[in-house]
């Protein structure tokens, strides 16, 4: 699909379709499946995306927004639950020394290879609209590696450590996003939830 042409066509359409991020709610239509099972299976994720696409007249389909996925690839500890998305426990990086030592993982580390495969499978199932890969944004990923609350303070106390982590996660996310595109994703949707947070 030529996404430039798609975007131009959108501008001229008199009525606009929604672009909801409905991946996890789709689980309620999948006969007793748990979130824990969903986030660990490329096949189930693709089926869930297809189910949402079948039930909604949306502009595009987007993969699961599992905001623990990329942090887990860096070595952070993910906690899994039956009825809610995974979460990162603790901080992997708290000092400049740990930021300097942080290694950029290969795509495929943790569950990232499974997520890339999920996009490839979803692209085969969903043929009537674009398929977007949901990827965490750099600052939100840095926050999961440094602790969501603590990064707000570290920005002031050790800004160089935050910059070092941001450089490394950005490098990784570019490679990861390209892997999603190579698997067939028509685009990449970045979720940077921490950008709107601040401390007083």
What do the PLM-derived regions correspond to, one by one?
Residues 1-83:
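N-terminal basic, low-complexity leaders that serve as flexible interaction/assembly modules and, when applicable
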Residues 1-27, 35, 106-200:
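Active-site loop segments of alpha/beta catalytic cores
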Residues 38-39, 73-87, 140-154:
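Aromatic- and acidic-residue-enriched segments that line the glycan-binding/catalytic groove
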Residues 42-47, 85-90, 156-160:
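Glycine-rich loops and low-complexity Gly/Arg-rich segments
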Residues 54-59, 96-106, 166-173:
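Low-complexity, flexible helical/coil segments
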